[in-house]
Amino acid sequence: MMKKILGVIPARYASSRFPGKPLAKIGDKTMIEWTYRNASRSSVLSELVVATDDVRIHEVVQKFGGRSVMTSSDHPSGTDRIIEVANQFSEYSIIVNIQGDEPGIEPELIDGVASLKASHPEWAMSTAAVPLLDFSHAIDFNRVKVIIDRNGKAIYFSRSLIPSQFKTTVPLYRHLGIYGYDRDFLLQYNSLPKSNLEESESLEQLRAIEAGYGIGIYLSKEAGLSVDTPADLEIVIEDFKKRKWISE
């Protein structure tokens, strides 16, 4: 029996670096609409919803024909928002957390992460990575690195350079912020003790690693552009013009 898969796009208005980011315009559409429409091209999602704590985002999504659910404004992380939504949609066995600040997200990335989780019920989660070819990016603390074992499972995530390249040059991989969760694991995630590694690296997924849960890695060919600041938005706008998605 095919597992039912729910895609969730968390969207906050009150971003410290870019307030109102989901409603920023790229051509004639908001960023959240671009993200939603591109994510909806996935071939494996049974349903796609935006999860937001802001009525302005909620109304915009409904206006362009998307599905949106209102969530609490007290969540300390995007994962907590996903958990609230998972509790509302009990019929789905896999929940995919899709970042709302990647308006050009490729549906193949969503399909890869979701399908990997569906084919490995023994893993609690799946996520994605991309080969890291620029060494300046490898030593950038804002770009999370991951080491992958021979079975395609994550060994460790870090903001530091891993592996160290001390004696031999080996491939490096950058983590991409998309997650496929086993529903039962997701609902008990907050009951896991906070990890020292999680606190040290400021990476939530290390809570699962330290508790002994498996995280599968889907290898993508390239990373999409994400928007953290208004300057990032301008880069995305230029990229969309090159793709002919918006006019000059």
From Swiss-Prot:
The keyword Cytoplasm applies. Keywords: Cytoplasm, Lipopolysaccharide biosynthesis, Nucleotidyltransferase, Transferase. InterPro entries: Cytidylyl_trans, KdsB, Nucleotide-diphossugar_trans. It comes from Leptospira interrogans serogroup Icterohaemorrhagiae serovar copenhageni (strain Fiocruz L1-130). Activates KDO (a required 8-carbon sugar) for incorporation into bacterial lipopolysaccharide in Gram-negative bacteria. It is found in: Cytoplasm. SUPFAM superfamilies: Nucleotide-diphospho-sugar transferases. It holds the Pfam family CTP_transf_3. Its EC number is 2.7.7.38. The gene is kdsB. HAMAP family: KdsB. GO terms for molecular function: 3-deoxy-manno-octulosonate cytidylyltransferase activity. Disulfide bonds: none annotated. GO terms for cellular component: cytosol. This is 3-deoxy-manno-octulosonate cytidylyltransferase. The lineage of its organism: Bacteria, Pseudomonadati, Spirochaetota, Spirochaetia, Leptospirales. It catalyses: 3-deoxy-alpha-D-manno-oct-2-ulosonate + CTP = CMP-3-deoxy-beta-D-manno-octulosonate + diphosphate. Pathway: Nucleotide-sugar biosynthesis; CMP-3-deoxy-D-manno-octulosonate biosynthesis; CMP-3-deoxy-D-manno-octulosonate from 3-deoxy-D-manno-octulosonate and CTP: step 1/1; Bacterial outer membrane biogenesis; lipopolysaccharide biosynthesis.
